Amino acid sequence: MRVSAVAVAAPASGSGKTTIATGLIGALRQAGHTVAPFKVGPDFIDPGYHALAAGRPGRNLDPVLVGERLIGPLYAHGVAGADIAVIEGVLGLFDGRIGPAGGAPAAGSTAHVAALLGAPVILVVDARGQSHSVAALLHGFSTFDTATRIAGVILNRVGSARHEQVLRQACDQAGVAVLGAIPRTAELELPTRYLGLVTAVEYGRRARLAVQAMTAVVARHVDLAAVIACAGSQAAHPPWDPVIAVGNTARQPATVAIAAGRAFTFGYAEHAEMLRAAGAEVVEFDPLSETLPEGTDAVVLPGGFPEQFTAELSANDTVRRQINELAAAGAPVHAECAGLLYLVSELDGHPMCGVVAGSARFTQHLKLGYRDAVAVVDSALYSVGERVVGHEFHRTAVTFADSYQPAWVYQGQDVDDVRDGAVHSGVHASYLHTHPAATPRCGGAFRRTCGLQYSTSVTALRKAGPEIRSGVTFAAKGVATRGARSPRLRSPLALMVATRGARSPR
């Protein structure tokens, strides 16, 4: 069954897409709909707010990361059990990854994704400082690309009743229906930092209150019936299936611990789904305050903002030691960006896990963009020469030890011949954010390594002298016992890693 969608776009960043999209998700849910939320592009932060509003995981649709052919199946997978989808766009409507020649349509734009799905676009226009000019703006966006259908406009930050009247007249002149008019209000402002909004998990209770405020404002000022009436989709793809994606894998029991909590909030829902499909039990733990779950066979350290919590991460020396010992035993450890920073010897002078020899520091230099990466060496995840498109998103720098083995070399239009990350034994750590659906073999390979390289390493260490064994006591225990588990985190991040059973945020 096809599930209709609307894509919420804007002429430019800063127009209020996230506010309107999140409020629309919440208002539709409040009206009795089951809403599937999506974000165009690789962004991890906005889906956290979407998840709070929808009560189910926020997901990403990025044809640059996963390719055009997977957008329809990932959409079909994400809308399962829903009756409508809201897709928040990225940047301006036609903005995306610009090709080396320029001039061609940008890949991964909101218009690109909307066209792939046959979804109509609702344009959010920041009305501050303009009135009749809105007609020219809407005319241009409506006629620029025949593959993009603008079904209506939501006017944001409207100054007064008179201002709204003039704006509506301008929209009529352009032939674009007005679906809502949002007044200027400070209650919808969300805190930001250098990489966008403060994450919903970090913002905590205030994030939930902000989502409630967005929901109330959209419910009051947007014609939901008109939004539903204009929704549509031409996508008729079979849903992406993680079981089919990972293929045949080892089925012996294995526990994969995924870092969560305030410091590790960047992750795609499909990652945990693929690990489960490969036969793993996925358990969250918070490195700020918890230890590894008993029986942990492998660790995933996703992205986030560890530089905001360096002292707290360093203070939990028990879990740092456990991760170090697990890695020393040959267990698979997959770390992206924040995970890499957590694995090095120190971050801004604070001791970290010491798994990767090197030090990291916060800088003022933003590294942001897609990367065409080539695997430099065989690892628990990739084969040498394997090509992956990923995303870099940080303001830190790592100085590796001279003897390190890099994970990737970046090639292509944005950066060329730049080496990133480190690989040794079962550890694969780098700045590169990847989408698991684009490289499903990795999930199975990572899972299989739990039962091969790890068990072999622990057996060898058991035979070693006590001075060596003392450093891997937890790792050996992890193989022998798989009974008790630490409590699952009670946080909105559970929605982001798709823990068993969709549930509303607490």
Identify the residue ranges that each predicted region occupies.
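Beta-strand->loop->alpha-helix junctions that form or flank phosphate-binding loops
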Residues: 39-40, 178-186, 281-288
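Internal gly/pro-rich beta-alpha loop/helix module
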Residues: 131-248
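C-terminal and late-domain segments of enzyme folds
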Residues: 250-252, 265-274, 281, 368-372, ...
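N-terminal amphipathic/hydrophobic targeting modules at extreme N-termini
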Residues: 458-462, 466-477, 491-493
